[in-house]
Each structure stands twice: as C-alpha cells, then as structure tokens.
Amino acid sequence: YCSEYFSTKWASIKGLPQNMTINTQYQKVIDYIKKHKSHTKEVAMVGGEPLIMKENNLLLDILPEDVLVTVISNMTTDFDKFPVPNKLLGRKRVGWSMSFDNIGKRFEYVRWGSTWEQLNKNVTTVANRINNSQQHGGIHSVYNIYNCTRLCELKQYALDKGITILWQYV
C-alpha cells in the first residue's frame, strides 16, 4: 500500500503542484509513442497494478503488434472484469513477471484480501499462453521469512505450470 504521501512524492520532487493530474504526463507519453511508434521496441507496464489501469488499455490500442510488452503483476486481478489482461493475452509478444511468493492459504495470508483461487486461475491462463505462444515469463518471487520453509512447494507449482521462477533476494 502506498500512502497519499508517496503517490504524490514524484510531483514535489519535480517541482510540480501535487494536485496536478497524471493525465498531462500520460498524454505526453501517449503522444510520444504515437509519434515514434515505428521505432518503439518495448514498453514496460510496471508499478501499481498495471492490469487494472485504464491508461494501459489505451496504450495497448496504439502499440504496434510487434512491440514487446513486459508486465509485472501480482496476478490477483479478475481477468474477466478488466480489458488489459485479455488484450495482453491476445498479443504475440508479452513478457509476464508474475509477482507472488507463496501458494494456497499462505498466499492468502501474505496477500491479505486476495484469493488463491483467483491467482491460480490467472496463473494457469497465463502459463497456458506462455507454453503455447511466443509469450514468455514466469514467477518473480522474493525469498523471505514467509516462504523460506516452503520453497519446494512453490517450485513444484511452477514446474506443474511449465513456468520458471526468478528469485529475488532481499
């Protein structure tokens, strides 16, 4: 969770009013990509939860099909309620970084408010796409106190889905 203080910190660092909407900056990015889309090779959707951001929906509409889209997601979004996940699944070149560290009830404990059922459904959907297309990716997990005794379970889960794990150490 980011408090309001941190979500507006970037504006104060740049000397901008904190009540300035992100639409101005976003429109500049969209205009730049439209102008240079023939030279755009990769776009990264990171920060917040990119699968629910309306801005990413428009971005996917203007990106050429050959542009690689990389996304870091906690994978807890209901894919049926937002357009971005399905647009990504329909593209040829997507790199998925699925950010979670535990499975089952332990996942629900660490990601309070999320359900294992939803995450597992989403990971299964993305893993099937990865295994049958040019899309790529896997689990990006942080080795921590909540999973240090359950690493084999997470590894087996990844193997069963046919995806990899990239371990991030803290």
Please provide the spans of the model-predicted regions.
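Hydrophobic positions in alpha-helices of CheY-like receiver
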Residues: L63, V123-I130, A158
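Conserved Walker B catalytic segment
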Residues: N57-I62
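Core AdoMet radical
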Residues: S3-Q27, S38-M53, P64-K81, K87-K121, ...
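Catalytic cores of alpha/beta
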Residues: I145-L159
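Conserved alpha-helix/loop element of class I SAM-dependent methyltransferases that forms part
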Residues: Y32
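Aromatic/hydrophobic pocket-lining residues that form the small-molecule binding cavity
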Residues: N56, L119, L151
